[in-house]
C-alpha cells in the first residue's frame, strides 16, 4: 500500500484530527516488534498486558504515530498520539479505511458455528468459484486464485483480514467467504465487514476456556447476524436448539434441516461409502444432487452451503451440479488408507464432544470389523469436555485409544486422566501418551476389516509440547504405520 496521510486516515475512520500534524503513514502495526519506519502503531489490549505499554519499542522501531487507550499513562512521545476509548474497534476501522474499505468491494459470505465451518466455507467457495473469482479466509489458509497463505487463526486479526480482503480485490475477486469464529466476533476482528449471507452451523461445547459459559458463547456467535455485520440473508440450522433460538430472533432467515418444514431440506437422502445422493428442496425449487462427501454431518454442511449460495443469487441447478465436484477438505474425514489395505484409516479434525460423536456416527455404518478411535484433548483448553469425549469414544467405538493431542504446558498424563474419568467401568481403552506410538500401535494391532479413526488434529502438521511446536502430521504418521503393516505381510 502507498503511504496515506494521517488526517485522511483519521477522517475516514471518524476520528478527530485537530491538534495533530498531517504526516505520511506508511502502514499499520499492532506488534511493536514488527513496526516498520513510518507505521502507525496501535496498542491493542491483551489478556495479560496492554499493548499501549509497548509504545517505547514501537517508537524505537520507527513508528510515526501511536493509537493508544485513553487510559494509558506515562506516554510522552514526540510523534502524534491518538487516544481512543475503544482501541480494538478503532483498530478494525483504521484497517478498513487504510486498505480502502475492501469488504465493500466484495460480496461476502460468513460462516459461524462450533463444527462444520471449514467444510461449509470450502463448499461455498467451490460453488462460487464456478461463477466468479472467489477468496477464502479460514482455519487452513487464506486463498484466492493464484495465491494461498497458511492461516495462524481461524479468523485473522483485523489488520490481517483487511489486508487479505484488499489483496483479493486487487486479484479480481468478486466474492469472499470467511470462517467467523466466536473469538473474532468477541474481539471485533471482522468489524468493517458486512455479509450478504451469514450461516450458523451449530453450537456445542467448545472454547469455554475463553467464554464464561454457553450463553456467552452463543451471544458471541449471534453477533454475526446483527445489522452491524449482516446485510443479507441468514441461513440457520434448525436441527440445533441454539439455531432455533437464533432463527426466531431475526428476520430474513432461511432455515435448513434434515426434516421437512425447514426452508431447505433433503428428500430421499441415501448415504453410502461413496457419498450422498438425494433431492434438495429449497425456497426456489427442487433439484437432484450427488456428493462424494460422506456422512450425515456432511449433508448438514452441504445444506448450509446450498442456502448461502442461493442467498447470493446463484442458480439452484448450477449449485446442484457443482456439489458433485467437491471432494472434501484436507483433514476432514480424509481417508489415508489405500484400496489395497485390509483396514480403513481416516484422519479428522474432530476435537469437540459433538464433533467426535458425529464423526464416529458417520463412520460406523461403513465399518465391517471394529471401529477404533485414536484421540486426545488439547492442553490449556476447556477441561470439562475431556471426560465427555472419553465417554463418547467408549460409547461409539469398539476400542478407544487415548493419547496426547497438543498438551501445551499441561502435564500430558493429567490430560489423559481427565479423559479416562469419562470412560465407564468395564470398557478397557488403550492408553499411550505418545501420539506417534499410539497411532502405530492402533494400526498394527487392527484386524482386517477394522476402521481406525484418528481424531483431533486433522490438517495440522504440528504438535505443541510445552511451549515448543514440533512437526507432526497424523496423516504422515498413519501412512508410515500402514507401510510397516504392509511390510510385515
Curated annotation (Swiss-Prot):
Annotated motif Meso-diaminopimelate recognition motif, positions: 405-408
GO biological process: cell division; cell wall organization; peptidoglycan biosynthetic process; regulation of cell shape
Alphabetical keyword list: ATP-binding, Cell cycle, Cell division, Cell shape, Cell wall biogenesis/degradation, Cytoplasm, Ligase, Magnesium, Nucleotide-binding, Peptidoglycan synthesis
SUPFAM superfamilies membership: MurD-like peptide ligases, catalytic domain (SSF53623), MurD-like peptide ligases, peptide-binding domain (SSF53244), MurE/MurF N-terminal domain (SSF63418)
PTM section of the record: Carboxylation is probably crucial for Mg(2+) binding and, consequently, for the gamma-phosphate positioning of ATP.
Modified sites of kind N6-carboxylysine: 221
Binding site for ATP: 113-119
Residues where meso-2,6-diaminopimelate binds: 381, 405-408, 456, 460
EC number: 6.3.2.13
Binding site for UDP-N-acetyl-alpha-D-muramoyl-L-alanyl-D-glutamate: 32, 154-155, 181, 187, 189
Keyword Cell division set for record: yes
Subcellular location: Cytoplasm
GO molecular function, one term: UDP-N-acetylmuramoylalanyl-D-glutamate-2,6-diaminopimelate ligase activity
EC class of the enzyme, as a word: ligase
Pathways per UniProt: Cell wall biogenesis; peptidoglycan biosynthesis
GO CC, alphabetical: cytoplasm
Cofactor(s) for this UniProt protein: Mg(2+)
Catalytic activity as recorded in UniProt: UDP-N-acetyl-alpha-D-muramoyl-L-alanyl-D-glutamate + meso-2,6-diaminopimelate + ATP = UDP-N-acetyl-alpha-D-muramoyl-L-alanyl-gamma-D-glutamyl-meso-2,6-diaminopimelate + ADP + phosphate + H(+)
PANTHER family with a match to the protein in the record: MUR LIGASE FAMILY MEMBER, UDP-N-ACETYLMURAMOYL-L-ALANYL-D-GLUTAMATE--2,6-DIAMINOPIMELATE LIGASE MURE HOMOLOG, CHLOROPLASTIC
Family of the protein in this entry: Belongs to the MurCDEF family. MurE subfamily.
Job of this protein: Catalyzes the addition of meso-diaminopimelic acid to the nucleotide precursor UDP-N-acetylmuramoyl-L-alanyl-D-glutamate (UMAG) in the biosynthesis of bacterial cell-wall peptidoglycan.
Record-given protein name: UDP-N-acetylmuramoyl-L-alanyl-D-glutamate--2,6-diaminopimelate ligase
Taxonomic lineage: Bacteria, Bacillati, Cyanobacteriota, Cyanophyceae, Gloeobacterales
Amino acid at each position: 500500500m502507498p503511504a496515506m496521510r494521517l488526517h485522511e486516515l483519521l477522517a475516514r475512520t471518524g476520528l478527530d484530527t485537530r491538534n495533530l500534524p498531517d504526516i505520511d503513514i506508511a502502514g499499520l502495526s499492532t506488534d511493536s516488534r514488527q513496526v516498520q519506519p513510518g507505521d502507525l502503531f496501535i496498542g491493542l489490549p491483551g489478556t495479560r498486558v496492554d499493548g499501549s505499554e509497548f509504545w517505547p519499542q514501537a517508537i524505537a522501531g520507527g513508528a510515526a504515530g501511536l493509537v493508544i487507550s485513553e487510559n494509558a499513562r506515562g506516554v510522552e512521545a514526540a510523534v502524534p498520539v491518538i487516544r481512543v476509548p475503544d482501541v480494538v474497534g478503532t483498530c478494525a476501522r483504521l484497517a478498513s479505511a487504510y486498505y480502502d474499505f475492501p469488504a465493500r468491494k466484495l460480496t461476502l459470505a460468513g460462516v459461524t458455528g462450533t463444527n462444520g465451518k471449514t467444510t461449509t466455507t470450502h463448499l461455498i467457495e467451490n460453488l462460487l468459484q464456478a461463477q466468479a473469482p472467489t477468496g477464502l479466509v479460514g482455519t487452513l489458509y487464506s486463498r484466492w486464485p493464484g495465491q494461498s497463505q497458511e492461516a495462524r487463526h481461524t479468523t485473522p486479526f483485523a489488520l490481517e483480514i483487511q489486508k487479505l480482503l484488499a489483496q483479493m480485490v486487487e486479484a479480481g475477486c468478486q466474492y469472499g467467504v470467511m470462517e467467523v469464529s466466536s473469538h473474532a466476533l468477541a474481539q471485533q476482528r471482522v468489524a468493517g465487514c458486512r455479509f450478504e449471507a451469514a450461516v450458523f452451523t451449530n453450537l456445542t461445547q467448545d472454547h469455554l476456556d475463553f467464554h464464561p459459559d454457553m450463553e456467552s458463547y452463543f451471544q458471541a456467535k449471534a453477533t454475526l447476524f446483527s445489522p452491524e455485520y449482516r446485510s443479507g440473508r441468514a441461513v440457520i440450522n434448525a436441527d440445533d436448539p441454539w439455531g432455533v433460538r437464533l432463527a426466531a430472533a431475526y428476520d430474513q432467515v432461511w432455515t435448513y434441516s434434515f426434516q421437512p418444514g425447514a426452508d431447505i431440506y433433503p428428500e430421499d437422502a441415501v448415504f453410502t461409502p461413496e457419498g450422498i445422493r438425494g433431492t434438495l428442496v429449497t425456497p426456489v425449487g427442487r433439484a437432484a444432487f450427488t456428493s462424494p462427501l460422506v456422512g450425515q454431518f456432511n449433508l448438514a454442511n452441504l445444506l448450509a452451503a446450498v442456502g448461502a449460495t442461493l442467498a447470493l443469487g446463484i442458480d439452484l441447478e448450477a449449485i446442484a451440479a457443482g456439489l458433485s465436484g467437491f471432494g472434501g477438505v484436507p483433514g476432514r474425514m480424509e481417508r489415508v488408507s489405500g484400496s489395497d489395505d485390509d483396514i480403513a484409516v481416516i484422519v479428522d479434525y474432530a476435537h469437540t464432544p459433538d464433533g467426535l460423536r458425529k464423526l464416529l456416527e458417520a463412520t460406523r455404518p461403513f465399518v465391517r470389523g471394529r471401529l477404533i478411535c485414536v484421540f486426545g484433548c488439547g492442553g490449556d483448553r476447556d477441561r470439562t469436555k475431556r471426560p465427555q469425549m472419553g465417554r463418547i469414544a467408549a460409547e461409539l467405538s469398539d476400542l478407544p485409544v487415548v493419547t496426547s493431542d497438543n498438551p501445551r504446558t499441561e502435564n500430558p498424563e493429567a490430560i489423559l486422566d481427565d479423559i479416562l474419568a469419562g470412560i465407564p467401568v468395564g470398557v478397557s481403552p488403550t492408553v499411550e501418551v505418545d501420539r506417534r506410538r499410539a497411532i502405530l500401535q492402533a494400526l498394527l494391532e487392527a484386524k482386517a476389516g477394522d476402521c481406525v479413526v484418528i481424531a483431533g488434529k486433522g490438517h495440522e502438521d504440528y504438535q505443541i509440547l510445552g511451549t515448543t511446536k514440533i512437526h507432526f502430521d497424523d496423516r504422515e504418521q498413519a501412512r508410515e504405520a500402514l507401510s510397516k503393516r504392509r511390510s510385515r505381510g
